[in-house]
Each structure stands twice: as C-alpha cells, then as structure tokens.
Amino acid sequence: MSEKEAGIEVQGTVEEALAGGMYRVKVDQGPTVLAYASGKMKKFHIRIIPGDRVKLELSPYDLTRGRITYRDK
C-alpha cells in the first residue's frame, strides 16, 4: 500500500457481533465503527466475541468502516 492509502491504526472494544462476519466496535478515541475480520483471522478461525480488545485499521477515505487486524489476549 502506498503512503497515501495507508490505513489508520486504532484500538477499540467489540460491542456486538453482527451477521455476515461484521462487528460493531467502539473505538477508544472516537465513534463506533463497523469492522470485519482480516483474511488471516478468518483463515486461522480466530474467534472474536463482544468484549474483546482489538486493533483496527481504518480507511482514510471512510472512517466509519474498518478491518480488525489483531485480537488482544
């Protein structure tokens, strides 16, 4: 990814698991966003449940959607 398209890394807490592999995540320094699990998380069957702390990557073009890249222990 070029510098212009680099995502914004933030942390948050999963509030709700939605249909279709989507999650509602409350970002620490901001609003609630819709996020999905990254491909590697799906591949290795990493489960994400409400209450989990996660790292998100937000698109600079749409700050209301993101990709979950890491689930904290």
From Swiss-Prot:
InterPro entries: NA-bd_OB-fold (IPR012340), RNA-binding_domain_S1_IF1 (IPR006196), TIF_IF1 (IPR004368). It comes from the Bacteria. GO terms for molecular function: ribosome binding; rRNA binding; translation initiation factor activity. Residues 1-73 form the S1-like domain. SUPFAM superfamilies: Nucleic acid-binding proteins (SSF50249). The keyword Cytoplasm applies. It is found in: Cytoplasm. Pfam families: eIF-1a (PF01176). Keywords: Cytoplasm, Initiation factor, Protein biosynthesis, RNA-binding, rRNA-binding. GO terms for cellular component: cytosol. Component of the 30S ribosomal translation pre-initiation complex which assembles on the 30S ribosome in the order IF-2 and IF-3, IF-1 and N-formylmethionyl-tRNA(fMet); mRNA recruitment can occur at any time during PIC assembly. One of the essential components for the initiation of protein synthesis. Stabilizes the binding of IF-2 and IF-3 on the 30S subunit to which N-formylmethionyl-tRNA(fMet) subsequently binds. Helps modulate mRNA selection, yielding the 30S pre-initiation complex (PIC). Upon addition of the 50S ribosomal subunit IF-1, IF-2 and IF-3 are released leaving the mature 70S translation initiation complex. Belongs to the IF-1 family. This is Translation initiation factor IF-1. It comes from Anaeromyxobacter sp. (strain Fw109-5).
